[in-house]
């Protein structure tokens, strides 16, 4: 199935300041994550015809063009069935249909629907995050689950670290030929990228736990120990990330965390 990527300039914390939108299929097509309207995307949407609009998640840097393209194409607008209010708030639109893990979105006429996109549950970066498998054994549109260079923000309270790491392992097990991310270039060695992201998270988690074991209690104290780099400009993101790691460690019984102070778990 044909997949076309559009890098759209938007206000985003992601490196490069762009979000990837995707058109999947040809006449008709599925539009994924229209972050904003652009002339180039307008032209191809008009040429191909869009039958469905789907979001990997409803963060602001992924939804800016939803209202315009929904009105322009009369496409079916899909929302995660567990997060309908969040969808309405983010897009200003009512969904036409609801999706959930395992849903299949078919493309084409009723008499010839041979192309399908399968929805995967992929929470962590966001609670409503899904990934999309393009045809059987095809690439996966992974949104903000993965990025080729750097790391993905998983910050509490919106992000959930335990879920995110499970999502990375799920994608690793699927082993798609490519990952099509929400930001940056296509990931053509998915398992290598997913292993790198998992190792990054496990390394940060070790440093958070070591900080707590060494006596750091508050977020600020743990932050200073868990990060070696200069946090100028990204301190709030780092703080949210540390909180997400602490919540994961607390659920697993490896630290005590009450939302304000941390302490080592009892042996």
Can you say where each PLM-predicted feature lies in the sequence?
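C-terminal regulatory/interaction regions
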Residues: 211-267
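Hydrophobic residues on short alpha-helical segments
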Residues: 194, 198, 202-213, 243-247
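Conserved beta-strand hairpin/beta-sheet module of binuclear metal-dependent hydrolase folds
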Residues: 1-46, 131-148
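Active-site HxH/HxHxD metal-binding segment of metal-dependent hydrolases
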Residues: 10-17, 34-115
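Metallo-beta-lactamase
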Residues: 111-123, 127-205
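Residue-level signal for the nucleotide or nucleotide-sugar donor/cofactor binding architecture
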Residues: 19, 64, 159, 237
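Histidine-centered divalent metal-coordination motifs
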Residues: 56-62, 125, 183, 245
């Amino acid at each position: 199935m044909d997949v076309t990527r559009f890098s759209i300039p938007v206000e985003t914390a992601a490196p490069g300041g762009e979000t990837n939108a995707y058109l999947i299929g040809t006449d008709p097509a599925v539009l994924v994550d229209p972050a904003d309207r652009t002339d180039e995307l307008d032209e191809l949407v008009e040429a191909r015809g869009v039958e469905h609009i789907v979001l990997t998640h409803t963060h602001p840097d992924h939804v800016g063009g939803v209202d315009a393209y929904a009105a322009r194409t009369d496409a079916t607008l899909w929302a995660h069935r567990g997060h309908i209010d969040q969808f309405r708030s983010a897009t200003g639109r009512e969904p036409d249909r609801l999706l959930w893990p395992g849903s299949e979105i078919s493309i084409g006429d009723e008499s010839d629907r041979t192309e399908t996109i399968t929805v995967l549950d992929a929470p962590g970066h966001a609670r409503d995050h899904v990934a999309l498998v393009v045809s059987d054994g095809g690439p996966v549109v992974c949104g903000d689950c993965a990025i080729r260079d750097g790391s993905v923000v998983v910050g509490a309270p919106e992000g959930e670290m335990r879920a995110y790491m499970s999502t990375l392992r799920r994608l690793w097990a699927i082993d798609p030929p490519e990952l099509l991310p929400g930001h940056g270039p296509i990931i053509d060695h998915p398992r290598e990228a997913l292993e790198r992201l998992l190792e990054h998270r496990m390394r940060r988690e070790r440093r958070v736990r070591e900080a707590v074991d060494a006596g750091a209690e508050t977020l600020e104290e743990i932050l200073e120990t868990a990060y070696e780099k200069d946090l100028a400009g990204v301190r709030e993101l780092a703080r949210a990330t540390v909180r997400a790691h602490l919540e994961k460690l607390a659920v697993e019984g490896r630290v005590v965390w009450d939302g304000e102070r941390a302490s080592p778990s009892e042996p």
